[in-house]
């Protein structure tokens, strides 16, 4: 799909200004706080990205992380894999626990949606979920290159993921829902819809020059066909 002709896509700054005028806040109210804990005894993988989150092609560099949201019946843990090429979510899973099985499920969902995922670099923090045998076996099964934050667990090493979680919570949750009055099943529904129906398909992204992730991806593959 190509960008419609004669349609001006507003800049992110313009969108934020209009949001301010109509009373919709876009400012995050909470600082991102990592929830995964490192297993000091576990084997770590090398930092292959070294804070370089730029990708010229889809499925070359991805980042993954988890975040938590409090509901009335407990916490919901959201795990996602973002493609650095266009900021799209290529894998998503949610559960009421933050075990390694949740990260494995996220990886499996990405592999189902994108069978060509083999060879991609997926970067994470050094949380025990990502150093677990269960997750490493899934990484090997799909031929993925595992990358992790450098020693010391510096938050900036996975800043791309932290930024995306902050945007999701700001746009979807803050000032719109009282999540602590919602069940985890209700939270699952709105978060799933947000990423699959809005984030990937309709949300403008400044790093994509104002294009939604899937539009940028489609234009990339269309350009390859034209060049062939």
Feature map (PLM): residue ranges:
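Hydrophobic (often cysteine-bearing) scaffold residues that line and stabilize catalytic clefts
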Residues: 11, 45, 59, 78, ...
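Basic, flexible linker segments flanking DNA-binding modules
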Residues: 1-57, 155, 212-222
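Short small-residue beta-strand/loop micro-motif enriched in glycine and branched aliphatics
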Residues: 86-92, 146-149, 174-176
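Mobile genetic element proteins and their domesticated derivatives, centered on retroelements
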Residues: 15, 19, 49, 65, ...
């Amino acid at each position: 799909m190509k960008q419609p002709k004669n349609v001006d896509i507003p800049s992110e700054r313009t969108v934020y200004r209009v949001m301010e005028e109509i009373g919709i806040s876009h400012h995050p109210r909470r600082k991102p706080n990592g929830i995964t804990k490192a297993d000091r005894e576990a084997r770590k993988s090398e930092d292959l990205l070294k804070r370089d989150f730029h990708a010229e092609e889809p499925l070359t560099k991805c980042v993954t992380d988890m975040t938590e949201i409090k509901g009335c019946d407990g916490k919901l843990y959201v795990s996602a894999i973002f493609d650095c090429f266009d900021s799209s979510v290529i894998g998503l899973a949610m559960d009421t626990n933050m075990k390694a099985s949740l990260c494995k499920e996220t990886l499996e969902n990405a592999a189902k949606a994108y069978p060509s995922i083999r060879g991609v670099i997926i970067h994470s923090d050094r949380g025990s979920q990502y150093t677990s045998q269960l997750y490493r076996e899934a990484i090997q099964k799909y031929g993925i290159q595992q990358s992790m934050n450098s020693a010391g667990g510096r938050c900036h090493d996975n800043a791309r993921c932290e930024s995306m979680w902050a945007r999701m919570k700001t746009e979807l949750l803050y000032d719109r829902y009282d999540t602590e009055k919602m069940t985890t099943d209700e939270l699952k529904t709105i978060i799933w819809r947000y990423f699959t129906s809005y984030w990937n398909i309709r949300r403008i992204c400044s790093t994509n020059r104002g294009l939604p992730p899937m539009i940028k991806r489609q234009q990339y593959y269309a350009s390859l066909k034209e060049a062939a």
